[in-house]
UniProtKB/Swiss-Prot annotation:
Protein family membership: Belongs to the amino acid-polyamine-organocation (APC) superfamily. Basic amino acid/polyamine antiporter (APA) (TC 2.A.3.2) family.
Keywords: Amino-acid transport, Antiport, Cell membrane, Membrane, Transmembrane, Transmembrane helix, Transport
NCBIfam families: 2A0302
GO molecular function: antiporter activity
TM segment ranges: 8-28, 41-61, 88-108, 127-147, 160-180, 220-240, 255-275, 297-317, 354-374, 378-398, 406-426, 429-449, 462-482
One GO term describing the cellular component: plasma membrane
Disruption phenotype: Deletion does not affect the growth enhancement observed in the presence of high L-arginine in different growth media, and uptake activities are slightly reduced.
Locations listed in the record: Cell membrane
Protein name: Arginine/ornithine antiporter ArcD2
Function: Catalyzes electroneutral exchange between L-arginine and L-ornithine. Can also efficiently translocate L-alanine. May function in vivo as a L-arginine/L-alanine exchanger in a pathway together with the arcT gene, which is found adjacent to the arcD2 gene in the ADI gene cluster.
Stored InterPro entries: AA/rel_permease1, Amino_acid_antiprt, APC_superfamily
Organism per entry: Lactococcus lactis subsp. cremoris (strain MG1363)
One BP term from GO: amino acid transport
Catalytic activity: L-ornithine(in) + L-arginine(out) = L-ornithine(out) + L-arginine(in)
Amino acid sequence: MENKKTKGISLFALLAIIISGAIGGGVFNLANDLARGSTPGGVVISWLFIGFGILMLVLSFNRLITIKPDLSGVSDYARAGFGDFVGFLSGWGYWISAWTGTIGFAVLMMTSADYFFPSKFANSNGSLTILSVIIVSIISWILMLLVDRGVETAAAVNAIVMIAKLIPLVVFSITGIILFKANVFTQHFWQTFTTNFAADGSVKDFVWHAMTVSGLLSQIKGSLMVMVWVFVGIEGATMMGNRAKKKSDTAKATVIGLAVLLVIYVLLSLLPYGYMDQASLANVKAPGLVYILNEMVGGWGGSLMAVGLMISLLGAWLSWTMLPVEATQQLAEQKLLPSWFGKLNKYHAPSNSLLITQLMIQIFIIITYFVANAYNVFIYMATAVIMICYALVGAYLFKIGLKEASVKNILIGFFTFAFQALALYLSGWQYVWLAMILYTIGFLLFIGAKKESHQSISVKEWLGMLVVTVLGVLAIVVLICGAKAGTAFDLRGLLGF
């Protein structure tokens, strides 16, 4: 009898997908991004709040893996709980989030290269140069071809990249601990402040005040998008659950991944506060850890961190090339996208989904030449859209808890939903509004899938599509015509146009 080797993604490879997906570029900008809006005390409270919210999300995933082992991925959960249309919104939103996140990786990678060759790869307003657009386009197509050769092969490569990317972060942590100055760290630990900006947009100085409740809430709000972004990817093992050697490994990988990520993020966000004063930290160029380590130990440190960041971004980029096509393939299997999206090549990779995703990435890579602060724009959009997917995971577990009278599932589901909804309301709804344009395009495919499978579209689904389409059209109108500068509806200002 022929002995066939069992294929599938191992526990270590699943863990690598989570860590490589989450530790992309955001962690390298974490300290200086947080310093612009939060003191060390505010950062600690923010980590407690956001850590609790992410823990609830992880527990929701793990509970659903256990009680609904036949389901896999965020769209599966949303569809099972709330029907085809909501399942489509979740899966399509996950797809949007994943590939817009890769644009953020591309921008930050070129910003890192700018450390070695100043002004060659990034413009002063945060947009990419034409040279950068060409380079990241080539890299993006290479990564697509790698995944097209087989998702399991790509996952193995990702495990190697994970180890390589952690080395400079460990070096930074050790250096930060050795050079830590308690008096610098505690100088303004529990205060709030107003910021005076210089003409070039840099922080001129902070005016310090005693901490107040409103001041603390403002610091937490200012930290939300930055902190939630660095956890996007925590669901990677769940999304790849159908390809795992053992389904139970997905839950283990998610819990271990959360613990590892929390330790890394808390260290890397707080240690710089103990090395330089907050105004200096807030003015550090992006990517922050590159220039902070350069300040700590000299040029070799900055070079090590810049190389580590580029490896990190390539690893995250590879992970995020796998995740969006898993989402579209699952939608096709659920008959929420045309079957064309679910077709596999001889390497069992969804080639058609990869091609469509890559074409969207290519279009938006070109757009980075025109968008100011392109990194923040794309990572904020990716974070805001995926919050909807995460909220639906919590809502589904909450619904199951009510049906089964399980207090544990009710509480975990409720806190997951409440955290994601609150975070989205406080800091990201404008980006979701922009994403409505892409949702509207997806409805054409949803309608096509329904016709292909000879299913009718309900009145509620038509109404849902109408509401989202109207919002998408309004977003286009505001982008073209503009809105009052500085208001919440100023989408052109949001994009730096």
